UniProtKB/Swiss-Prot annotation:
Residues 107-120 are annotated as: J segment. Transmembrane segments: none annotated. Keywords: Adaptive immunity, Disulfide bond, Immunity, Immunoglobulin domain, Receptor, Signal, T cell receptor. Residues 1-11 form the signal peptide. It comes from the Eukaryota. This clone was isolated from a cytotoxic T lymphocyte. The lineage of its organism: Eukaryota, Metazoa, Chordata, Craniata, Vertebrata. This is T-cell receptor beta chain V region PHDS203. The keyword Chloroplast does not apply. It comes from Mus musculus (Mouse). GO terms for biological process: adaptive immune response; cell surface receptor signaling pathway. Disulfide bonds join 34-102.
Length: 120
């Protein structure tokens, strides 16, 4: 009898967000950048306000293929490479102060550490 065991350890999937904390003045442009290392086609941007769950802002199915989520007003996105997905606020408002999360993958999602944006 020959037994063969194949290693199936956890895969380390990384989602990076370039800034953990940002402070901007009202009316300034804001660029939130997200990167991933698994070349997933599907990526997401969410925001989470105190006491609320995640709210989907945008979803991207691949390069230059994006759909609005539940709260797209005041935001736009850019995805020129599969590994990068940026969220853009052209004129930041105080009500956009929140924690923003980028995620990759479908159906299982892997999240970045989040970026806390404060608009003064």
């Amino acid at each position: 009898v020959v037994l063969c065991f194949l290693g199936t350890g956890l895969v380390d999937m990384k989602v990076t967000q370039m800034s953990r904390y940002l402070i901007k003045r009202m009316g300034e442009n804001v660029l939130l950048e997200c990167g991933q290392d698994m070349s997933h086609e599907t990526m997401y941007w969410y925001r989470q306000d105190p006491g609320l769950g995640l709210q989907l802002i945008y979803i991207s199915y691949d390069v230059d293929s994006n759909s609005e989520g539940d709260i797209p007003k005041g935001y736009r996105v850019s995805r020129k490479k599969r590994e990068h997905f940026s969220l853009i606020l052209d004129s930041a408002k105080t009500n956009q102060t929140s924690v923003y999360f980028c995620a990759q993958g479908a159906p299982e999602q892997y999240f970045g550490p989040g970026t806390r944006l404060t608009v003064l």
